Regions:
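Conserved PLP-enzyme active-site core in the AAT-like
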Residues: 1-217, 221-236
Length: 238
């Protein structure tokens, strides 16, 4: 999960928390492995939070089904644990599932949504939480240097992104599917079954050389480990 792989060990550094990943083949948590991980003995660190990512970046932008989310929430609830949804691309999941965005976030104690990915805002994200946690969240935001001044202009862009951005996501998904199918027809190693939203991962022998070739042709993509990642978005032409 992004929370585990890409945040510089921040949970340990800032909160003294140990993050324990659970297998999630195809981005879907292995419920049996999760249930086993939740069984803690007297010599193991206690669990304080269960976090889930949807859509799942490293799995190729795949979507966790709502029934799987509900099962994860049930497991946490049975043990008195709060839950957090890393929903940076929550609206992509909602479009794929054919539901309102609120349905993807439903049942979690807290959730995060990015405004600057598929929704198209220049910057920003939202923390969704119950009213009783708001004061504490604002205190920690200030403590960690996250307070802004004169943020109204960017907030206006964020509101517009929330209102207008979701309309464009289905097209993003369709472009990703078309791209994946085109790469597959060229004989390149792409898993068509993993293309559910707006990401396409490509297995190549020389990722850096491949990316240089793309840049020479005016195409920008990224490298994730030994793979090349394409992300489709509203600023691309058909």
């Amino acid at each position: 999960a992004h929370l585990y792989e890409y945040e510089l060990g921040a949970p340990a550094l800032l909160a003294g928390a140990l993050v324990r990943p659970v297998p999630a083949p195809g981005g879907r948590p292995d419920l049996k492995a999760l249930e086993e991980a939740l069984r803690r003995g007297p010599f193991q660190a206690p669990i304080g939070l269960l976090a889930l990512e949807n859509t799942h970046n490293l799995a190729g932008g795949r979507v966790v089904p709502l029934e799987v989310q509900r099962r994860v929430q049930d497991l946490a609830r049975a043990r008195g644990l709060p839950t957090h949804l890393d929903g940076a691309r929550l609206h992509n999941a909602a479009v794929f599932l054919g539901v309102e965005a609120r349905e993807v976030a439903r049942g979690f104690t807290t959730a995060m949504v990015s405004l600057s990915k598929g929704l198209g805002a220049p910057v920003g994200s939202l923390l969704l939480l119950p009213k009783e946690l708001e004061a504490e969240a604002r205190r920690y935001r200030k403590l960690l240097g996250g307070g802004w001044r004169q943020a109204g202009v960017l907030a206006a862009a964020g509101i517009l992104a929330l209102e207008e951005g979701p309309k464009h996501l289905r097209r993003d998904h369709e472009m990703a599917r078309a791209l994946a199918e085109g790469l597959f027809r060229l004989g390149l190693a792409v898993d068509l079954g993993a293309v559910e939203t707006n990401m396409v991962y490509l297995e190549v022998e020389d990722p850096e050389g491949f990316l240089q070739g793309l840049r020479a042709r005016g195409v920008l993509a990224g490298r994730v480990g030994g793979r090349v990642r394409f992300v489709t978005h509203r600023d691309l032409m058909d």
